[in-house]
Amino acid sequence: MMPTKPLAEADPQIAQLIREETRRQAEGLELIASENFVSPAVMEAMGSTLTNKYAEGYPGKRYYGGCEVVDKVEQLAIDRAKQLFGAEHANVQPHSGSQANMAAYFALATPGDTVLAMSLNFGGHLTHGSPVNFSGKLFKIVPYGLKQSDETIDMDEVARLAREHRPKVLMVGASAYPRTLHFDRFAGIAREVGAALVVDMAHIAGLVAAGLHPNPVPHAEIVTTTTHKTLRGPRGGLILTREAHAKVLNSQIFPGIQGGPLEHVIAAKAVAFHEALQPSFKEYQRRIVENAQALAEGLKEAGLRLVSGGTDNHLMLVDLRPKKLTGKIGEEALGKAGITVNKNMIPWDPEKPMTTSGIRVGTPALTTRGMGPGEMATVASLIGRVLDAPADEKVIAAVRGEVRELCAQFPMYQDRL
């Protein structure tokens, strides 16, 4: 028989931990650039009976019966993703951005081929060729980086390395780069050397959808993204491509690297895409950028150095070396004060990845809560106070109290506490 007890009775320990996490999110300042708060509608879709259904294959071509409803769900997600980004084809089945990237590589290259990608040390992602990741183990990775003069991507170096190494794939994208990515310039380099252009827009997908960042879809053979972060959907992946690549790309997801798709998550993706197609989403993205610029100015006024001097998107990197702090110390001190950030490598970082010399800060989650430039000035001041006295328990406690007061003005998930 089916267990019918609600979660609080069926598993009080998990129920309590969920309440604790919800309270942590509601009472703290979430500044991790890759995190956001999904809508109740997205969560409702993820918790639906769609989680029960196996559906190997694609709409209309399944290996299981009973897929007539999930076919409609998945097709809605596909159609909405295509409309949102102006793409010819969309695959909504990737369980994550990493799996989306894996499928993109396998669709365009074979193990041992050369891939030109942004170095993790300069803001790239693990799946862009880190030696500890599948991408670095299966492919010959040639990394590119930044100019020391302004800490922006060295496009001359990208062109030089492309001509020298003739990569099969030119991967563009970053997990910690605060400036605009000029996809047209990358596309020109890729064409010159006969490389396929792949763009990982995981961090900036929401900005792209709102027209606040250049769209890579017209320039790239394949575009990958997560569906959370600025897109504000469930945790998952998405691939966009041209119709000419659709068949081979689909086969790399299933049966290549995945089995059954998560139709409850795909439904949540569809809901998020629907939300992103509304005019209010464009205004939300505009506010993300406005808040990021206000936060950046506030951090500079607090005496903090920002990599590249500021931001064009939703995130910024703070160099803590002038404060004689590591990223690890900064993250821990801010965490005690109720401000969540992540330690992050900065360009030419002398520290190890688990220590780092910087922190990464972003505004998507606080913008979802309704905070604006005025609150960003306050947040910047709070961050500055903590980083000026990271070991002072009185300062930490005082800031923690102010954080709670600020968060109380922008309540969230109250029915779940």
Swiss-Prot record:
Task performed by this protein: Catalyzes the reversible interconversion of serine and glycine with tetrahydrofolate (THF) serving as the one-carbon carrier. This reaction serves as the major source of one-carbon groups required for the biosynthesis of purines, thymidylate, methionine, and other important biomolecules. Also exhibits THF-independent aldolase activity toward beta-hydroxyamino acids, producing glycine and aldehydes, via a retro-aldol mechanism.
Catalysis: reaction(s): (6R)-5,10-methylene-5,6,7,8-tetrahydrofolate + glycine + H2O = (6S)-5,6,7,8-tetrahydrofolate + L-serine
Pathway: One-carbon metabolism; tetrahydrofolate interconversion; Amino-acid biosynthesis; glycine biosynthesis; glycine from L-serine: step 1/1
Binding site for (6S)-5,6,7,8-tetrahydrofolate: L120, G124, H125, L126
InterPro entries attached to this UniProt entry: PyrdxlP-dep_Trfase, PyrdxlP-dep_Trfase_major, PyrdxlP-dep_Trfase_small, Ser_HO-MeTrfase, Ser_HO-MeTrfase-like, Ser_HO-MeTrfase_PLP_BS, SHMT-like_dom
GO biological process: glycine biosynthetic process from serine; tetrahydrofolate interconversion
Family: Belongs to the SHMT family.
CDD domains per record: SHMT
Keyword Transferase applies: yes
Main localization, broad class: cytoplasm
Keyword Cytoplasm on entry: yes
GO cellular component: cytosol
Matching Gene3D superfamilies: Aspartate Aminotransferase, domain 1 (3.90.1150.10), Type I PLP-dependent aspartate aminotransferase-like (Major domain) (3.40.640.10)
Oligomeric and partner information: Homodimer.
Annotated localization: Cytoplasm
Organism: Anaeromyxobacter sp. (strain Fw109-5)
EC number: 2.1.2.1
UniProt keyword terms in alphabetical order: Amino-acid biosynthesis, Cytoplasm, One-carbon metabolism, Pyridoxal phosphate, Transferase
Cofactor(s) it depends on: pyridoxal 5'-phosphate
PROSITE patterns from the UniProt entry: SHMT
Protein name in UniProt: Serine hydroxymethyltransferase
UniProt gene name: glyA
Residues carrying the site annotation Plays an important role in substrate specificity: H228
Modification N6-(pyridoxal phosphate)lysine occurs at: K229
Molecular function per GO: glycine hydroxymethyltransferase activity; pyridoxal phosphate binding
